[in-house]
Curated annotation (Swiss-Prot):
Chain's gene name: LysD
Superkingdom to which the source organism belongs: Eukaryota
Stored InterPro entries: Glyco_hydro_22 (IPR001916), Glyco_hydro_22_CS (IPR019799), Glyco_hydro_22_lys (IPR000974), Lysozyme-like_dom_sf (IPR023346)
Gene3D superfamilies xref list: 1.10.530.10
Entry coiled-coil feature ranges: none
Signal peptide bounds: 1-18
One GO term of the biological process aspect: defense response to Gram-negative bacterium
Expression sites by tissue: Found in the midgut.
Protein species of origin: Drosophila melanogaster
Protein's UniProt name: Lysozyme D
Length: 140
């Protein structure tokens, strides 16, 4: 009986753990948030390789004890405040949990800040996204 109650509780909580987007839904939402259209295919590629388009992903612990959060796998040592309270530069000025929600606004704004300060190579998956990319024109 306890196992059943736990399963029901987890099933009800599942929507709180983020959502899975696709290339086009991400491109449209980012466009609506003002991201330049010529960047959308590259962002979609990064999201695909970093999180498989999942907003609620917390990556495994990195070599320095940090973790990466959300659809763009943003690092908690530099960019957001981890729930553990561990030191962070928190350059985006937000909790890492804000990067795990269905609303990707915080993730997009923080990712844009990462891009402006470190460029595309800030993402370890960048090499998958540096050449030819599929067009996102069919998404609009």
């Amino acid at each position: 009986m306890k196992a059943f109650i736990v399963l029901v509780a987890l099933a009800c909580a599942a929507p709180a753990f983020g959502r899975t987007m696709d290339r086009c839904s991400l491109a449209r939402e980012m466009s609506n948030l003002g991201v330049p259209r010529d960047q959308l295919a590259r962002w979609a590629c990064i999201a695909e390789h970093e999180s498989s388009y999942r907003t609620g992903v917390v990556g495994p612990e990195n070599y320095n004890g940090s973790n990466d959060y959300g659809i763009f796998q943003i690092n908690d040592y530099y960019w957001c405040a981890p729930p553990s309270g561990r030191f962070s530069y928190n350059e985006c000025g937000l909790s890492c949990n804000a990067l795990l929600t269905d609303d990707i606004t915080h993730s997009v704004r923080c990712a844009q800040k990462v891009l402006s300060q470190q460029g595309w190579s800030a993402w370890s998956t960048w090499h998958y996204c540096s050449g030819w990319l599929p067009s996102i024109d069919d998404c609009f």
